[in-house]
């Protein structure tokens, strides 16, 4: 029986064949869901999908787009927001 921490489905079960021919189970943390736009809910491109520890290892330029609200709003919603802010000035 697996250790208690591995009994939940928080971990993915990956079946691997060892060099000796046995099948063993490796437990891996699941990837988080894809990042979504805060306004329309569309999937954000250019933002990696990984656990925080994996994303922390990436260079800053690969973590999210380098524009205002990058990694938070999609380009379409950002365009609308900028136009709206300019009109309210």
From Swiss-Prot:
Gene Ontology molecular function terms on file: structural constituent of ribosome
What GO cellular component entries does it have?
Answer: ribonucleoprotein complex; ribosome
GO annotation terms (biological process)? translation
Keywords from the UniProt entry: Ribonucleoprotein, Ribosomal protein
Q: According to its UniProt record, what is one Pfam family this protein matches?
A: Ribosomal_L34e
**Is Ribosomal protein found in the keyword set?**
yes
Does the keyword Ribosomal protein belong to this entry? yes
The family line of this record is: Belongs to the eukaryotic ribosomal protein eL34 family.
> Which protein, by its recorded name, is this?
Large ribosomal subunit protein eL34
